[in-house]
């Protein structure tokens, strides 16, 4: 039984899931929106929201916690200086997931995840 086992495996091992989450979070925070599968978007949402909430702390410790997951210095700078202040008054709910149809090759549901 898998009681209490949150999260999805996404048909990957642990390190590949971490790499996927970091890469997609970096792309989302850099571009503001990305298109991916619905399942990956649902896994990405809490990861990015926790990063933004951490960045709202605004101090050096918060910057280092963000840099631990986002390995692009420009994106870390953008999160700390632009994204976090934008959501200073907002208590969560920084992202939106929109379904955009199915992928032609395998019929999987695609989604657009964007910063609100």
UniProtKB/Swiss-Prot annotation:
Any single GO BP term: translation
GO molecular function: structural constituent of ribosome
Assigned keywords, A-Z: Ribonucleoprotein, Ribosomal protein
Superkingdom classification of source: Bacteria
One matching Pfam family: Ribosomal_L17
Signal peptide feature range: none
InterPro entries: Ribosomal_bL17, Ribosomal_bL17_CS, Ribosomal_bL17_sf
SS bond partners: none
GO cellular component: cytosolic large ribosomal subunit
Subunit structure: Part of the 50S ribosomal subunit. Contacts protein L32.
Homology family: Belongs to the bacterial ribosomal protein bL17 family.
PANTHER family: LARGE RIBOSOMAL SUBUNIT PROTEIN BL17M, RIBOSOMAL PROTEIN L17
Full protein name: Large ribosomal subunit protein bL17
Source organism of the structure: Deinococcus geothermalis (strain DSM 11300 / CIP 105573 / AG-3a)
